[in-house]
Amino acid sequence: MSIFRALLSSLALLCMAAAPTAFATELLAKADTRMPAATMYEPADIQNVSRVVVRKGERRLYLMDGEDVVRSYRISLGDNPEGHKLYEGDERTPEGDYTLDWRNAESDFYKSIHISYPSERDRELASAWGLNPGGSIMIHGLPNDVGDMAFAYTGLDWTDGCIAVTNEEMDEIWQLVSNGTPISIHP
């Protein structure tokens, strides 16, 4: 009986030790651990960002000068990233053509640039279902209170529908993109 108890105790300890490993494995499975793509130009070399393109399925945001990609960033999206945003609280990132229309240096996240969602069409769709389309969709950095846990956000979809980048990337986007810049968000 004592051998059985020893084996049972060992098994219990092994299971308890494996639980954090299983959790970490689950997080890593959701994360994109690839190295980010090399940037093509130094900030001083970039004369104009004429538009921003987001490809949700690729988890990429591109700063464009005409047809040239001048910057590319790995992004995080809403917790429910597939499909167009339909209503407030659906945790989806909208799809379509919008404008980056204003910015907030003092937001709850490290800097934010507002996307002009909802459009008139977005309002009509939500209204047809008796729903509020939501709003306050932004490109932003990490939460201001993230502290030493910034690494935990990398590669995960964690926003309520916004497009998130690292704080360093947000500094660069903030510098390179002007208010009034068009943004196209694709599936």
Region roles according to the model:
Residues 20-24:
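Sec/Tat signal peptide C-region and signal peptidase I cleavage site
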Residues 35-51, 56-57, 77-101, 121-125, ...:
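N-terminal post-signal-peptidase region of extra-cytosolic proteins
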Residues 41, 94, 102-187:
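Exported/periplasmic cell-wall-interacting domains
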Residues 68-80:
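Short Gly/aromatic-enriched secondary-structure transition segments
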